[in-house]
């Protein structure tokens, strides 16, 4: 396990997240990209295990291996056994084999889901330094590597441990979609020989046309992002309708309960004035059962995904607007 023994001995809170930055070897980045290029198709997600170690306040990810693609009908495949065999093989060849998280590809930034939440909670509950690396192949194909690291916040970890996803539980814990995931800064490290090779390749590469930098990105990206955003907004509206229905039913039941109690009080007062014994006590909670509150965790995840789509659209449009202004300035200077 990659957790520090010192923190456990000192009695520090495991939810303080001592890791402040993540160092990723270039080999890991290339393996993740290669995994998606070989097995990822369109919206299909690829996943794998991250290996490394913790050094002071830095998490060093030094290696990784992919999860093999398998169908639900493949009952003979044991994912846990596969991970143990892979880690045992890496240990035999003297490679870092400590489990420090996992990685996953994303399709147009669609990674905020219940499956990711449950998986990251399992990893982080077992090893507090665990993170998930999200690789976006579409943004990477546009010319800049998009690789981000996330982990669950302490508030969300407590909520997931208690499994209290009711509106009252989330309100008491003050958990909103902004407080679900936190991004950890990462930097990529290469050996000195690789850095020299990259510098040499850069010197030998031919100079590309500078005007290519002003080419606008494909409109399909914006169209698909807006379509996914509208789908999530529709899901959010449906959840809002369900929650409003629950609130109306709860208010109606509370009103009926108060009216019933008032009638009993009036009737008991009349019976007491006539010298008669009061009515027997009844279990009001059995007579007026509260409606089942809809779980709000899915709504928070939808809100987080909507926010993610909005950020992606904002970045996409701001880059294109900047290119338009630069192209206009170049055209006016040349004329």
Swiss-Prot record:
Ranges for domain MPN: 22-156
Segments carrying the region annotation (Disordered) are 254-282
Compartments where found: Cytoplasm
Q: Is the keyword Protein biosynthesis in the record?
A: yes
The job of this chain, per UniProt, is described as: Component of the eukaryotic translation initiation factor 3 (eIF-3) complex, which is involved in protein synthesis of a specialized repertoire of mRNAs and, together with other initiation factors, stimulates binding of mRNA and methionyl-tRNAi to the 40S ribosome. The eIF-3 complex specifically targets and initiates translation of a subset of mRNAs involved in cell proliferation.
Family, according to the entry, reads as follows: Belongs to the eIF-3 subunit H family.
> What is the designated name of this protein?
Eukaryotic translation initiation factor 3 subunit H-A
Q: Which organism is it from?
A: Danio rerio
């Amino acid at each position: 396990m990659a957790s520090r023994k010192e923190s456990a001995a000192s009695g520090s809170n495991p939810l303080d997240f001592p890791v402040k930055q993540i160092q990723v070897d270039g080999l890991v980045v290339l393996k993740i990209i290669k995994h998606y290029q070989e097995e990822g198709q369109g919206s299909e997600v690829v996943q794998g295990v991250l290996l490394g170690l913790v050094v002071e306040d830095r998490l060093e990810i030094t290696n990784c291996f992919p999860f093999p693609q398998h169908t639900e009908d493949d009952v003979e495949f044991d994912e846990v056994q596969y991970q143990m065999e892979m880690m045992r093989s890496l240990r035999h060849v003297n490679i870092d084999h400590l489990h420090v998280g996992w990685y996953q590809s994303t399709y147009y930034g669609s990674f905020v889901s219940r499956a990711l939440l449950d998986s990251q909670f399992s990893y982080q509950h077992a090893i507090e330094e665990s993170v998930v690396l999200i690789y976006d192949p579409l943004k990477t194909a546009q010319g800049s590597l998009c690789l981000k690291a996330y982990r669950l916040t302490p508030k969300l970890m407590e909520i997931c441990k208690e499994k209290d996803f009711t509106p009252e539980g989330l309100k008491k814990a003050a958990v909103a979609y902004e407080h679900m995931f936190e991004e950890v800064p990462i930097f990529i490290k290469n050996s000195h020989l690789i850095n020299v090779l990259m510098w040499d390749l850069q010197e030998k590469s031919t100079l590309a046309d500078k005007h290519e930098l002003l080419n606008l990105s494909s409109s399909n990206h914006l169209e698909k992002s807006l379509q996914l955003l509208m789908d999530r907004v529709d899901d959010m509206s449906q959840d809002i309708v369900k929650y409003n229905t629950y609130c109306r039913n709860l208010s109606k039941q509370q009103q009926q309960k108060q009216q019933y109690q008032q009638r009993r009080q009036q009737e008991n007062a009349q019976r007491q004035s006539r010298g008669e014994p009061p009515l027997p006590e009844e279990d009001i909670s059995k007579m007026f059962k509260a409606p089942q509150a809809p779980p709000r965790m899915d709504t928070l995840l939808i809100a987080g995904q909507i926010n993610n789509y909005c950020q992606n659209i904002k970045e996409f449009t701001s880059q294109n607007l900047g290119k338009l202004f630069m192209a206009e300035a170049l055209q006016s200077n040349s004329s």
